[in-house]
Curated annotation (Swiss-Prot):
PROSITE patterns in alphabetical order: RIBOSOMAL_L33
Protein name: Large ribosomal subunit protein bL33B
Superkingdom as given in the UniProt entry: Bacteria
Matching NCBIfam families: PRK00595.1, rpmG_bact
Length: 56
């Protein structure tokens, strides 16, 4: 049963578009968001909010 939940909600990495290499790790629901995830989050290396894109 646990295998089914990991397929539906895989662990993904959100990589900074500022080019710093900083990443966030999160889960997403494939049924609700089948496209690649793009979130605006804080990058502590450049000390500002930048877009983080899903890297598989």
């Amino acid at each position: 049963m646990a295998k089914k939940t990991t397929q539906l909600r895989p662990i993904i990495k959100l990589r900074s578009t500022a080019g710093t290499g900083y990443t966030y790790v999160t889960r997403k629901n494939r049924r609700n968001t089948p496209d690649r995830l793009v979130l605006k989050k804080f990058d502590p290396i450049v000390r500002r909010h930048v877009e983080f894109k899903e890297a598989r």
